[in-house]
């Protein structure tokens, strides 16, 4: 048995919003990652943005809670004034909203890639960070 742990993927608001909408293909892909031992980071504020986007959907919260219950999923909270200051700086330099800025701030300090459905939205903001994150775009969860 190997002690290797893959580098975690940070899920952006778009990925979480599609999970909250019940995208079965995307949920299946994330389940496959979890079964393979791939850690998935769920930024708490990105989850907030996903729930705001899916407001009115009776299953949105349950779907995100299900994702958070995966064996290799970790919900990353915003913890304290120091992290709040880092988030504020990230928002200021990238122009991202608070939801995706939370994902970017985590990526900037952890050197973990961001998993997204829309890589283009990350191109410019990534350049503004001290440690530009690697962006992984899901182009077709069926493949």
Specify the residue positions occupied by each region the protein language model found.
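Short, well-structured N-terminal submotif of metal-dependent ribonuclease cores
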Residues: 1-42, 52-66, 142-143
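Acidic, PIN/NYN-like endoribonuclease modules and their adjacent C-terminal/linker elements
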Residues: 2-4, 108-143
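Phosphate- and divalent-cation-binding pockets in alpha/beta enzyme and binding domains
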Residues: 49-50, 86, 124-125
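Acidic catalytic patch
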Residues: 70-93
């Amino acid at each position: 048995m190997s002690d290797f742990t893959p580098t975690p993927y940070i899920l952006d608001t778009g990925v979480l919003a599609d999970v909250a909408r019940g995208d079965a293909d995307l949920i299946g892909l994330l389940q496959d990652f979890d079964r393979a031992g791939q850690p998935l980071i769920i930024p708490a504020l990105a989850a907030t943005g996903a729930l705001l986007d899916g407001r009115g959907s009776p299953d949105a919260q349950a779907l995100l809670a299900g994702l958070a219950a995966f064996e290799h999923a970790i919900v990353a909270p915003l913890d304290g004034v120091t992290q709040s200051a880092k988030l504020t700086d990230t928002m200021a330099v990238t122009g991202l909203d608070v939801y995706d800025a939370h994902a970017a701030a985590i990526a900037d300090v952890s050197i973990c890639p961001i998993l997204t459905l829309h890589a283009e939205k990350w191109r410019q903001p990534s350049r503004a960070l001290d440690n530009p994150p690697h962006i992984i775009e899901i182009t077709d969860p069926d493949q």
